[in-house]
Amino acid sequence: MLKTPLYESHLAANAKMVDFSGWSMPINYGSQIQEHNNVRENCGVFDVSHMLAVDIQGKDAEKFLRHILANDVAKLEAGKAQYGCMLNHEAGIVDDLITYKIDSENFRIVVNAGNRESDVAWFRENSQDLDVKITPQQNLAIVAVQGPKAVEIVKHTVTTEVAEEIAKLKPFTFKFFSNWMFARTGYTGEDGFEIMLPADQVADFWDNLLENGAEPAGLGARDTLRLEAGMHLYGSDMNTTTTPLERGLGWSVDLSDENRDFIGKKAYLTKKSHGITTKWTGVVLKSKGVLRAGQEIDFDNGEKGYITSGSFSPTLKVAIALAYVPKEGANPIVNIRGKELEVELVKAKFVKNGQSLI
């Protein structure tokens, strides 16, 4: 199994390790709910070094990314980041990722752990005739520091000059300091940073964060935090057979430039013109029980919806889920252990900055 540069740090913190996409990763350090609540109330630090930063450089870098991404990097200013999907020719989602624009000839993309090899292969396959260099940054570690106290804690671990600069960063902006990159991005619905730095420096940085008040958080808390924030998990909420339209991600597909042709555009437009029969939604269980991926939601007109991610919400203290359901139909229910239980359909975003949105 693959190990991140922080593997020994996790063992020292008594982490429970699990296999995630072939990586040995911490699921928790004792209490997933405590780690979740700490991110909502204070500051948690996650090892996300199983994800991969890929640098895209060259004269045709922007042209290349405008072709393989459904969002349009031409809209990005230097120093800003953008969420988007990479589609196949049938408009299915190959991956969802964040693109960071350094300048018009230099970009960085962070791809999901389970798609590291396939994404890099896709990049190479679709850049053969272009002046583009694709460099997977195998020697970078990635740490996410998240929560209302994240900025203050990170500031205490860096020089005064760096602290002043990173405090000015707005959401979805980033800045380099030598070979460290600080991005005001995250996967929790809280403020904070995702920091990319040399793998051989990350253990000391991790220790420094903990000494200054951050507490480690595992993949379990990361999953419930992102679910509360209404953020998608690749492989659970979408895959190569689903389009952005069907998963509430149509906003991330930029169709404003009619002359731009991106992979999957034709199929996407066809699907858009025909319309889709489902809608993406949040789900709240009105009684005790747990919602899980794969559960059916039954409607009074005989139609069914399906849960793609579900869990108990530590913040809201109810079971919540993300699901796709028919556009028509009322009185949704789920069947849990032989009992028919009512659920409520809500906007697919439950918590923001620690506050309930439902």
Swiss-Prot record:
Pfam families: GCV_T (PF01571), GCV_T_C (PF08669). InterPro entries: GCS_T (IPR006223), GCS_T_bac (IPR022903), GCST_C (IPR013977), GCV_T_N (IPR006222), GcvT/YgfZ/DmdA (IPR028896), GcvT/YgfZ_C (IPR029043), TrmE/GcvT_dom1 (IPR027266). It comes from the Bacteria. GO terms for biological process: glycine decarboxylation via glycine cleavage system. GO terms for molecular function: aminomethyltransferase activity; transaminase activity. GO terms for cellular component: cytosol; glycine cleavage complex. Keywords: Aminotransferase, Transferase. It catalyses: N(6)-[(R)-S(8)-aminomethyldihydrolipoyl]-L-lysyl-[protein] + (6S)-5,6,7,8-tetrahydrofolate = N(6)-[(R)-dihydrolipoyl]-L-lysyl-[protein] + (6R)-5,10-methylene-5,6,7,8-tetrahydrofolate + NH4(+). The keyword Oxidoreductase does not apply. SUPFAM superfamilies: Aminomethyltransferase beta-barrel domain, Folate-binding domain. Its EC number is 2.1.2.10. Belongs to the GcvT family. The glycine cleavage system catalyzes the degradation of glycine. PANTHER family: AMINOMETHYLTRANSFERASE, AMINOMETHYLTRANSFERASE, MITOCHONDRIAL. The glycine cleavage system is composed of four proteins: P, T, L and H. This is Aminomethyltransferase.
